[in-house]
From Swiss-Prot:
It holds the Pfam family Bac_luciferase. The gene is ssuD. It comes from Cronobacter sakazakii (strain ATCC BAA-894) (Enterobacter sakazakii). This is Alkanesulfonate monooxygenase. It catalyses: an alkanesulfonate + FMNH2 + O2 = an aldehyde + FMN + sulfite + H2O + 2 H(+). Keywords: Flavoprotein, FMN, Monooxygenase, Oxidoreductase. CDD domains: Alkanesulfonate_monoxygenase. Belongs to the SsuD family.
Length: 381
């Protein structure tokens, strides 16, 4: 099975060390462009662009990278409860059209009540997933060309429609990650690819089995992906030295503050990440070549595969054997590590190198009439 390998645009900052401004690097448009172009040339399928108050806006960053890349896809966040499904569908179709079919979408419900309150969202965990499920039903139907009337507990639309369809048909793929029961229910019913953070293989195997069973109950199948950091070097010894250097400037106070911030979140996935290391730095190899040091201070994905190319490839193939076909990777600093992954890891994997998409002609049309419909040619009698 050919694997889809993604990279990451660090719009929330980058550098040589975690939890310190030592070795930090300005993240401006030029730097993000360098990373995107490196990923494009090396053969990564796409890039994940993060979302949240600590990040630049993912949609604007993705749009700015379209003209400077050829085949790279952009995985950007859909934010239920922050934007209406109709507006989000319109934005999604436009991004897909502007990129000639290179848009992918990642449903993000949010996990930090404090940050969500700042965005005007005051729903609890269960209610957020209810709202996300309603949002996704409307969003999918609109992109698939339906005119939608919908009234739910959280969302109500009447006569919603898109005049300009996406390039990808029936619609661009929808990604989603969540470890709670309600999250898995949503994934099973509506998404195309279920994402997990980099837990040990046995835990990932259990989650995949749960989502597969729930999807089968809906008569559906779901693809699977995993989010991991990577520290790959010419030798495994060098890789572990690089892992140690990454947290060399971390002190106990910084770790404690980070873990306290994570503890206020209601994300089951974040709780599972924190449990892998318990805030301690003395037992960070939690599974062969799987290192939890990143999660001491980084929210979300907190584990890294560490080793030389053949070793990391073997671990990736262990996950692939569980049914995972997409790997969203990253490393610090992201420009240099993109090249290390391309040079040291890619030769040992069956990587699905994307083709350069050919321009797809769009149907000729005049200006929308009364902002309501597209004019059609009238047959002459």
């Amino acid at each position: 099975m050919s694997l889809n390998l993604f990279w990451f645009l660090p719009t929330h900052g980058d550098g040589h060390y975690l939890g310190s401004d030592a070795g930090a690097r300005p993240v401006d448009h030029g730097y993000l462009q360098q990373i995107a172009q490196a990923a494009d040339r090396l053969g990564f399928t796409g890039v994940l662009i993060p979302t949240g108050r600590s990040c630049e806006d993912a949609w604007l960053v993705a749009a700015s990278m379209i003209p400077v890349t050829q085949r790279l896809k952009f995985l950007v966040a859909l934010r239920p409860s922050v934007v209406s499904p109709t507006v989000a569908a319109r934005q999604a179709a436009t991004l897909d059209r502007l990129s000639n079919g290179r848009a992918l979408f990642n449903l993000v419900t949010g996990s930090d009540p404090q940050e969500l309150a700042g965005d005007g969202v005051f729903l609890d965990h269960t209610a957020r997933y209810e709202a996300s499920a309603e949002f996704t039903r409307v969003w999918r139907r609109l992109l698939e060309g339906e005119k939608v009337d919908f009234e739910g507990k959280h969302i109500k639309v009447r006569g919603a429609q898109l005049l300009f369809p996406p390039v990808q048909q029936p619609r661009p793929p929808l990604y989603f990650g969540g470890s709670s029961d309600v999250a898995q229910d949503l994934a099973a019913e509506q998404v195309d690819l279920y994402l997990t953070w980099g837990e040990p293989p046995e835990q990932v195997k259990e989650k995949i089995a749960q989502v597969r069973a729930k999807a089968a109950a809906h008569g559906r199948t779901v693809r699977f992906g995993i989010r991991l950091h990577v520290i790959v070097r010419e030798t495994t010894e060098e890789a572990w030295q690089a892992a140690d250097r990454l947290i060399a400037h971390l002190d106990d106070e910084t770790i404690a503050k980070a873990q306290a911030a994570f503890a206020r979140q209601d994300s089951v996935g974040q709780q599972r990440m924190a449990a892998l290391h318990g805030g301690r730095r003395d037992q960070l190899e939690i599974s062969p070549n799987l290192w939890a040091g990143v999660g001491l201070v980084r929210g979300g994905a907190g584990t890294a595969l560490v080793g030389d190319g053949p070793t990391v490839a073997a671990r990736i193939n262990e996950y692939a054997a569980l049914g995972i076909d997409s790997f969203i990777l990253s490393g610090y600093p992201h420009l240099e590590e993109a090249y290390r992954v391309g040079e040291f890891l890619f030769p040992h994997l069956d990587v699905a190198i994307p083709d350069v998409p050919q321009p797809r002609p769009l149907t000729a049309q005049g200006e929308a009439v009364a902002n309501e419909f597209i004019p059609r040619r009238v047959a002459q009698s």
